[in-house]
Amino acid sequence: MFDDFLADLRKPSIEKYDWMNDVELILGTKENLTQAIDECIASEIYGCDIETTGLDNRVFDGRTVDSIVGIGLAPTPDKAYYFPIGHRAGSEYNIPWSMVGKEFGRLFHPDTKANPVFHNIAFDSVFLEYNGFFPLGVDRWDDHKKWEDTLIVKYLLNPRQKGGRGLKALSDQLCGMKMIELNELIPDEKIKDYATLDPSWEPCVWYAAADPLCTLRVWNILRGQYVDAPEHSDSIYNLEKMCLVSVSWMHRSRVYVDRNRALESCKEGQRLWWESLLEVYDGASEILGRDITPNYLRIMKGEIKGAINIFEPDDVGNDSKMSYKIRVDEARKEAKRNYPDPVQVISKNVALVGKEAGTEKIDFPIVYDIMSPQQLGLLFRELKVPNLIASEKSGQVVTAGDVLDDVIEKAEKDFPFMGKVKNLRFLSKALGQYLIPFVEDVGKDGTLKPRFDQFAADTGRFSCKSTSKPWEVKDGGCRVPFQGIPAYGKDKDKKPAIISYMRDCIASRGDGWWLVAIDYAGVELRLVTNLSKEPLWVKAFFECSDCGKQYPQEMNDDNIPKATPTYCVCGSDRIGDLHTVTAVAFYGENAKNLPDWKDKRGNGKGCNFALSYGGTGKAVQRTIGCSAQEGEEKYRKFTGTYKTLAKWWTHQHDFGRKHGYVKTAFGRVQPLPDINEGDFRKKSKDERKAVNGPVQGTSADITKLAMSLIYKEVKKRGWFDKLKMILTVHDEIVFEIHEDVIGEAIPVLTNLMSRNKGIANQGWAVPLLVDVEIGKTWGVPYDLKDLKRGYKEKLVPDGVDEEGKKKYKEIQVPVPESLGRIFYEQGSEEQAPKKEVKSEPSKPVYTIGELTKEEARNVALWLVENEGGIVQYNNKDVSALFI
């Protein structure tokens, strides 16, 4: 008794809010469990929430790392139960697992009519699925009609709101019901384990039962707001729910990392970073006429006798994790302690930042730590770098990425070392955010778990958050923001080779497995064309810009535009080359024959991307590096050429001003709260969003719908052990596929992504196309189009030549034998239809059997030469597989 008295004294004092006296918050027991389940089943919808030992819902060996402690149910907005299941304190109150399985099996049965409503089901459902709650399987969570989520509704109502989406904030804001915080119950920051609480302690029940009750009340309010707002559509809510299931599958699939390759990439990256850092210091010191190297860098260089923190690029990934960041920190501490920098300053008059005229006197340090943004800004001022921008809050020079890139681009001619500053920052980011975490954070199974958030961006696009939370970093949690990994495309000379190092670290996980990356080819320009109906661009998408051949604009039986061939009869792959169309509009048809045509086409490409989504002459100036006058001239020429596109911009602006929002092709609302603002900057930003938002948002809707369809198809075909969806980055979805099914799977996936009626039947004139790449790593893919053409080589970075220019080498890319069968294997009739060959004497027929890659190449060339010919296999027309 006395021990109980002392235990009560140690418990914190918790305030019971007034609203809690007006509802029933009940401790669940063996005696009332059946009654509570019956009440939930009898209701149309009930609140549901779980308490856990922690937040780690990663799955190993069929179980989550943390586990369920208890579950809360609210059959009505005025009544809720909390059923303890895994409490260590007060364990005598736990419901026996035999009863849990039986009763919750009834509640979560797929045939149960009543639906649970969660707040963030993405978290709860994984715990429920992998902690023994579903003896009948998990079909309930796969069916988006069987559950609701207040977090999704709140996001869709106001996607631009970045905070205030938590249950406690919503309960207070919408219901006037303040909730108890977990740190009130468990003040110790190191212990956030609900199992340490005794469920017989009333505040434990108040907290846990309030969650489902408040969730149900918030749902009733948010659902009403969503239904009553005519601009919102249930189709988008259902799309987000369907996508959530596929994202959960993707999270469970995880990403395999070749740690040895990552380690070597880290060493090479650190070597490049070290060289770049020294080059920046040498360049700035030469301009200023004094050595600005701080002592911590001298320590790292080994120039200070007796100092211990000497930098070695190979020093990464060992037990001490002495990566460059840690070595910099240690060297700074050593320098501060034993070798402090000189405190003298140099006073100079320099131009005011961001002002047209005027100077001010600044005390500059003798040496600089350019790894510090503040000191880097000071260095720029002493160097008299032009076009610097000052922060409105601090007055210091802004050195953020985009701003700095603009400054560098304008100043690089007079200050060549500025390009080295940009390269140094890129290398620092690549190492710190990607390569080093690839080495240090990989889990015991060799994988990382990216954290994809489908409810972060107002456009609907995914974001991938980095984290430093211990429960997310340890054993495979992910610090890597995958969305930030740049594409390694055709503009290789403009991108540091380290990009390929990042992608090379993502690998297939063993023999027989291949990475397959499928991305929507030029999707945003295709969407701009479809949304604006610009006739010149519609025409261009069916025309070869090299020979001028025009392909027919036809619809299939599902009212989906038929795809154009990848290669023209002339051998060119430039069908739908809008950049050539724009360049010809600027410079004339004869410009194609000029020596600088490549640069002129590049300007056309830059203008397309700068202006298509609502940009101005300033955007042209930034993109192609021209004068302000030329930027405005090109803007006027662009709008004068593409009049329908310009009218669409105006329509979007007018609609946005009238309604305060615009929509994607699928009905997603893009709020524009500032489009009628007096503030020119805010107004201009929302005017750009009125054009750009529907384009990016429609692209996001397409990707999310494709992911949902892919999950269902993989489940239907029983491919979960042969096909994994591991990443979605920009307009690309990355899979890991076993070669046993790869030949069959690729046509299924590409048809789902580009030809499915739900995606492509939007009344569009221009088809969606996808590109397929395959490889053992994400960085060395084999383009499927090239495979069909018989190509075997790929260019990859191979250091630099004597002039410092990047070199490339051809490598042989291995291809699975089963990939050759893609040319003749049949997919399902539903996903990859192939029509019976009909007798058409005017069309030559090429009958094939099983093909080698060289034979497949010859068939493809025959089909190009005999336009309209038929390739026949097993009495089926398989011509489409060679186009």
Labelled PLM ranges:
Residues 3, 8, 134-147, 180-349, ...:
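Mixed-charge, glycine-rich, non-catalytic linkers/tails in nucleic-acid processing enzymes
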Residues 119-120, 207-223, 230-257, 272, ...:
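Core structural elements
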Residues 559-573:
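Cysteine-rich micro-motifs
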Residues 2-28, 56, 66-228, 239-240, ...:
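Active-site-proximal helix-loop-helix substrate-binding element of RNase H-like nuclease domains
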Residues 156-160, 216, 249-273, 616-629, ...:
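Catalytic palm subdomain of template-directed nucleic-acid polymerases
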Residues 21-28, 40-79, 88-93, 99, ...:
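Acidic, glycine-rich two-metal-ion catalytic cores of nucleic acid-processing enzymes
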Residues 550-555, 572-575:
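Cys/His-rich microdomains that often coordinate metals
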Residues 216, 266-300, 304-305, 638-654, ...:
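Polymerase palm active-site segment centered on the conserved acidic dipeptide of motif C
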